[in-house]
């Protein structure tokens, strides 16, 4: 048994999963930080909206140069920190006897439980961080989140960042997360 509760921080799908854990195991979670992750209303119709999954089967490339040239952020966005993208790309690949491939698990979306109709009910303090250029910021989903969670969740925006806040503004994001964790401790 844990001696103290934990803080969860998640981006995109990770934020969605962190909110699920905070809802299902409130005795475990002290605070929740969600970074540009949509929490959809229970009546959201997933079948009417385009999804980024499932992932495609693993593809092999003949050279490191070729696979690195294919690296993209998903969803696509411009990024001014090329050095950071190169770093992420370099650590997202591995060489095998069949060639170069991405490290992701192509079984991920088959193993995840869909949360259609799930009503998130976390009660811990929460912070939602979004980039000012994120498509989520002006969406109906954001309006739902602000309405449903305004009593327990703060909403903060990092200027000049899109969905991949941690790539666009890593220092600003780290500072905001650290400030919130200090406030909660």
Give residue ranges: language-model regions:
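Alpha/beta-hydrolase fold nucleophile elbow
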Residues: 2-12
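Core-facing hydrophobic residues within beta-strands of well-ordered domains
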Residues: 3, 28-29, 152-153, 161
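Glycine-rich nucleophile elbow surrounding the catalytic serine of serine-hydrolase chemistry
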Residues: 10-20
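Flexible "cap/lid" loop of the alpha/beta hydrolase fold
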Residues: 19-23, 28-62
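Conserved alpha/beta-hydrolase catalytic His-Asp/Glu region
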Residues: 60-114
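Hydrophobic "lid"/C-terminal helical patch
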Residues: 71, 173, 177, 181
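Conserved serine/cysteine hydrolase catalytic core
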Residues: 94-148, 154-157
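Catalytic histidine-centered segment of alpha/beta-hydrolase-like enzymes
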Residues: 158-174
């Amino acid at each position: 048994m844990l001696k103290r509760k934990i803080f969860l921080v998640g981006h995109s799908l990770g934020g969605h999963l962190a909110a699920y854990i905070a809802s299902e195991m409130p005795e475990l979670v002290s605070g929740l930080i969600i970074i540009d992750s949509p929490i959809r209303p229970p009546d959201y119709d997933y079948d009417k909206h385009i999804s980024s999954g499932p992932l495609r089967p693993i593809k092999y490339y003949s050279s490191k140069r070729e696979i690195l040239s294919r690296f993209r952020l998903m969803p696509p966005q411009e990024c001014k920190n090329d050095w950071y993208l190169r770093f992420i790309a370099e650590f997202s690949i591995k060489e095998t006897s069949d060639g170069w491939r991405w490290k992701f698990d192509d079984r991920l979306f088959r193993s995840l439980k869909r949360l259609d109709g799930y009503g998130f009910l976390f009660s811990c303090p929460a912070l939602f961080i979004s980039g000012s250029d994120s498509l989520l910021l002006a969406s109906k989903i954001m309006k739902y989140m602000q309405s449903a969670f305004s009593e327990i969740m703060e909403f903060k925006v990092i200027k000049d960042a899109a969905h991949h806040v941690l790539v666009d503004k890593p220092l600003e994001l780290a500072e905001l997360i650290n400030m919130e964790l200090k406030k909660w401790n």
